[in-house]
Every structure is written in C-alpha cells, then in structure tokens.
Amino acid sequence: MIVGIPKEIKNNENRVSLTPSGARELVQRGHTVYVQHTAGINSGFTDEAYEKAGAHILPSIEDVYGTAEMIIKVKEPIESEYGLVREGQLVFTYFHFACDQQLTEAMIKSKSVCMAYETVVDRQGALPLLIPMSEVAGRMSVQEGARFLEKPQGGKGILLGGVPGVKPAKVLVLGGGVVGTNAALMAAGLGADVTICDISLPRLRQLNEFMPKNVKTLFSSAHNIDCLLYTSDAAD
C-alpha cells in the first residue's frame, strides 16, 4: 500500500503521525511511504531520518494526498484539506466527528474511508488509541494549572507542592477516568493535597488501592463539589 504522511497544519499542532522507525517498519513489510517535506521537523525528525528509513520525501501536501492510497494523520483535516481527500482514499486520524458537522459532511461528500482513532475498541472494551492522548491531557492539565497559580498569570502565587513551613496547594480532580487519574498522579507527585471525585464507588475503591497518601477520594455530588471548589486552589 502507498502510505502518505502530510504535515499537520492545524493551529498549534506540532506532532507527526509516523516516526522514522514507524516508516521503517512499513517499508520492511513492503509498503511505500511518502512523507511531506519537514512533516516531522517540529517533533525532532528530519527529512533525512525518514529517507534513511526508506521513506520518500514529497514537496507539498497536495503531492502527498494525490499520491497516497492511505493518509495517516494526527488531527482531523482542516477546511483547506477537504478538497484534497479523494474517493476511496483511507484516512486514519483523530476525527471527533460528533462535534464538527462541517468536517463530517465534507468527508461524506469525499466518499473516502475514514478511521477515527478515538472510536477503536479492543476486545476488553478499552479505547487503546484514545488512552495515550488522555494520559497526556491529564498530566498537561496539572502543568498548566501550576503555571496559572503564578502571580504573573493572575494566580495566588503559590506552589502546588508548597515549601517547608507552608501548606501545599489543594487540587480538585473531577472524574476518575484516564484523564483524571493521570492529573491526580501528576499533582500528587508534585506534592499537592489532592481530592479526586467520581460517581462510581467501585472506581473510587480502585483508586484508593494505588493512589499515594496525599490523594483522597470522594463521591461526586453537587454538595461535595460546591464545598471543594470553594476551598481548592486548582481544579482539573
């Protein structure tokens, strides 16, 4: 199969859908891989690295879409890409069709075959392609929250973990799923006083088994959340 890797052009998206090592794996299995010029540069991968892996470099996004039988992306095509997707072409990416009617209609009109990573379910009922994104989101939320606690960002001017003689920040995490679990672990690792709320008592019991001592679990109710929001320094 002819596989195309276009450069991501959505605002603030710096990732690339296939690493040079991934390209090498595909080439060794008999596939042809075309990568747009500088597609991987913002992720630290040069064109030369892809060429050494056996991939071919194409100068433009139009060339990649026009050549490939299967397009592999990170994020959904933006409006300028709609016309590049052609009938029968396979497009693998995170689409999130439910929140974007224009994108959905454009892909239907193109008659392409779309595989939305976020809908892939394994035999255990898990979402193996969505979980890594959720792990990143949970951990990043704490980093961003810590930044907005700084005075220059309009915050209280406190550290998540405090310092000797000063209490740590109180962090509230709503939901004990993948995002919430990773947010709680990240905040706890920085020394914060963390409370994680969820509506599932079985899930709260699971969290109690492996969370560090500075993480408390609490049933998610309107009353509990109202009280915690009033006293928390940060909420994820």
Where does each model-flagged region fall?
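Glycine/serine-rich phosphate-binding loop and adjoining beta1-alpha1 elements at the start
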Residues: 8, 82-169
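Glycine-rich phosphate/diphosphate-binding loop of Rossmann-like nucleotide-binding domains
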Residues: 13-28, 34-36, 159-229
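Generic secondary-structure signature for well-ordered alpha-helical cores
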Residues: 28-32, 55-56, 70-73, 109-113, ...
